[in-house]
């Protein structure tokens, strides 16, 4: 059996950036992280975490937040009961119903937020992770998050229009 997910990069529009992936049902969150990295073309150069922080009900004072990440990157700000080891926690234990969602943040500096939605199970014995559908090019690493990416797209659109625009493009390339 395999788990099927739609992973959508949030706060990036025109075009939307999303991937549909399938992974074996025994995958841990660390393995899901690797599958997402490959599907989006990220280079796995930064820290990551899964959590409910971006999606939990902030109007409900009893809503708990949690973090699933590598143990060596556990923050002192996070209480022990809120932290889970991504190499030990199986995705299938957390996302059990069609439509269940979790937030995946890659690069805690640029803060690329992805919504991971569980689409259901597939009855197949294909091995490994697979990207089966998608849309939109993934932003480049270290471009400054959503705001930096918006600036980069503007620079690219204007690069040939004036000397100042060409200089701005060159400055970005040199950075």
PLM features: what roles do these ranges have?
Residues 1-175:
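Short linear regulatory motifs enriched in tryptophan with gly/pro/ser
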